[in-house]
Every structure is written in structure tokens, then in C-alpha cells.
Amino acid sequence: MNRANRVVRGIWLFGFIACLASNAASNEAVAERPNVIVVMTDDQGYPELSVHGNPVLQTPHLDSLHDESLRLTDYHVAPMCTPTRGQLLTGIDAARNGAINVSSGRALLRPEIPTIANYFGDAGYATGVFGKWHLGANYPFRPQDRGFQESVWYPSSSIPSVPSYWGNDYFDDVYIHNGTEEQFSGY
């Protein structure tokens, strides 16, 4: 097993252990359980945050999250968005989880593999995903089929700057909210 696979499995194992620990502590008040929020940006590198020393880009809200949160500092991404997302959600390398590309049917997680949302949901957490999904737009690949109780997502790899099939162009776009197309207002 190469180093990258060990790192991905370590991240997944950490999340799984956190779920088990929170489940074991279910006698404690729910308010004492930690909130778990995973922020994954698309096509943003490590040096593109002001907290990491970028002299041009100012990212005060992300810097605040950085300062107040647990950070996974040794997670290695794939050269494309879909394999990276699949690895984070399953803890399994893209070559084994099925999401190895961004097109041609190779952007689908194997349905028998549970996601981190399944484990957190089983531990009593509310789960949600918001934003780009690009891991399948039909059953059994949609967020609501993969353990997410709440979802607002876009069923493609990007929102183009010219209107798409849905008329999306970053303003007043149509997203899929818990399985139903819904018009949203704003940017």
C-alpha cells in the first residue's frame, strides 16, 4: 500500500473512529458532541489562503475556520476533482472506489461502499452536502442515496459562465434540493 493510500485510509479511519466515539458517548448531552463540517474547495491550492502567507488573496473567513478547527494537514488529492471527492467520502483510493475520472461513467462511487455520511448518520449526526457533487446524478449515486439527509447540489462538473441546460450561470441558478429541481436566488 503506497503512502497516499495509507493517508486516505487514515483520514477515513479517523472519521470512523470519531463516529464510534460520539456514538459511545451518546449518554452525554447532544450539545457536547462536536460539530463536524468538512469544507472542500474546488481547484484551490494550499498557498491560496492568506493564513498560509498569500500576500495578495485575502480570505478572512477561511482563515478564521483554519484558526478554530482541526485541520487534516496530510491529505493528498487526485489531479481531478471527482476522484478526490470520492476518496474523501469513502476513505478508499479512487482506483478501488470507482470514481476514477470526471466522465464516461467513471465518476460514480461503487454503490456498495458506504460513505462518511452513512457512518455519521448511523452515529446520530445530521448529514448534508451542499454544492458540487459530480459523483452521479441518478439512483443509486445521488447524495440522498449515499447517506446525506439534506442536499443542495449541482449535477455536473461545473457551472459555466454562459448559461447551461438549466440556464445556470452563477446567478439565480437551479439546483437539486433533496431530489427536486429548485430555483435559488442570488449568487
What feature does the model see in each segment?
Residues 1-12:
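Bacterial N-terminal signal peptides that target proteins for export
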Residues 10-21:
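Bacterial N-terminal signal peptides
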Residues 24-187:
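Formylglycine-dependent sulfatase
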